[in-house]
Amino acid sequence: MDSIWTKSVDLPSFPQLQGDKKTDILIVGGGMAGILCAYFLQKQGIDYVLVEGRTICSGVTKNTTAKITSQHGLIYHKLVKNMGIEKTGMYLKANQEALQTYEELCQKIECNFERKPSYVYSLDDPWKIEQELSALDE
């Protein structure tokens, strides 16, 4: 499947690792999660090696919509029901902090980051939206 990212971005290539390597931390996977781990480790001066079996950002990251959100469908009602208020609050807070971190990172690079509103709707089950709002109000 073609991706907008592979059509519009020239990704760097790196030589294959040769011989034995010693590192404090090994990051397996060069998608967004792996690259972000490497970024934060580098900022802390921690020795790491990132390995990717194919091309950087060629897996899930390549096919992402690049939408960064804390709204992942109608999940908060389910989280409150199954995990409780405290853990649901921790999940929401972690997602909100991630959004803020992405925004701060994107101010340092040219990537056309924009904050936009998001919406959830239901044509058939409006009560699900009401449950979600109730969970978020808690």
Predicted regions and their residues:
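Glycine-rich FAD pyrophosphate-binding loop
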Residues: 43-63
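Dinucleotide-binding Rossmann-like beta1-alpha1 core, especially the glycine-rich loop
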Residues: 71-138
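N-terminal Rossmann-like FAD-binding beta1-loop-alpha1 element of flavoenzymes
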Residues: 20-50
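Extreme N-terminal leader/targeting segments of oxidoreductases
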Residues: 1-25, 43
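Short, hinge-like loop/turn segments at secondary-structure boundaries
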Residues: 66-70
